[in-house]
């Protein structure tokens, strides 16, 4: 089984905000596979589909961003998901809007959702797909990440989401993560 985790904050007030990038990636992947009914389990919204007979679990933690690990770890345990079979999609302020980057490990880079997952899984070594949201120029970091994309950013962001979805779909079938990084980075 593979597990794709999209990070974000639950609630209408956070819809389409930069910090909900992971949710938007998972939602787009779900849409592509005609999935529209997530259910609640272990502080998360989950759904699944199959690729070549293997189950792929989509996860959107409902714990709010800063406590995402509290939802992720119990699902990994319940479904017996190995760290190599999990990937996390999330926003990255240190990359231009829409740019994606895949990594197998690394620090949280100041991202509280990733900090929480690292704390709950006990390692920095897990797969990630980061989608650039750019860095604020005038507003505070909190206001920026909890704000919506500016009109001139939307097209680049949507391309980034589509590229992240393509990378995640490839991830479900490619054994060698380095090949995937070479293709998308």
Curated annotation (Swiss-Prot):
Ligand binding (tRNA): 14, 64, 66, 112
UniProt site (Discriminates between blocked and unblocked aminoacyl-tRNA): 9
A cellular component annotation (GO) from this entry: cytoplasm
Keywords, ordered alphabetically: Cytoplasm, Hydrolase, RNA-binding, tRNA-binding
Localization, UniProt: Cytoplasm
Alphabetized PROSITE patterns for the sequence: PEPT_TRNA_HYDROL_1 (PS01195), PEPT_TRNA_HYDROL_2 (PS01196)
Stored InterPro entries: Pept_tRNA_hydro (IPR001328), Pept_tRNA_hydro_CS (IPR018171), Pept_tRNA_hydro_sf (IPR036416)
Reaction equations catalysed: an N-acyl-L-alpha-aminoacyl-tRNA + H2O = an N-acyl-L-amino acid + a tRNA + H(+)
Alphabetized Pfam families for the sequence: Pept_tRNA_hydro
Sequence similarity: Belongs to the PTH family.
Description of how the protein assembles with itself and partners: Monomer.
Protein name: Peptidyl-tRNA hydrolase
């Amino acid at each position: 089984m593979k597990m794709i985790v999209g990070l974000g904050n639950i609630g209408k007030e956070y819809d389409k905000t930069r910090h909900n990038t992971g949710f938007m990636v998972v939602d787009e992947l779900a849409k592509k596979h005609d999935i529209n009914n997530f259910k609640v389990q272990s502080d998360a919204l989950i759904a699944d589909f199959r690729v070549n007979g293997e189950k792929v679990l989509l996860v959107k933690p409902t714990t709010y961003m800063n406590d995402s690990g509290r939802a992720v770890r119990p699902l990994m345990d319940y479904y017996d998901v190995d760290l190599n079979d999990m990937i996390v999609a999330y926003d990255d302020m240190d990359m231009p809007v829409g740019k994606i980057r895949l990594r197998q490990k690394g620090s949280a880079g100041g991202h509280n959702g990733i900090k929480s997952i690292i704390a709950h899984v006990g390692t920095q070594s897990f797969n990630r797909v980061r989608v650039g949201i750019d860095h604020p120029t005038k507003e505070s970091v909190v206001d920026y990440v909890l704000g919506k994309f500016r009109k001139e950013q939307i097209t680049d962001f949507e391309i980034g989401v589509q590229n992240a979805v393509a990378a995640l779909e490839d991830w479900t079938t490619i054994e060698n993560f380095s090949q995937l990084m070479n293709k998308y980075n």
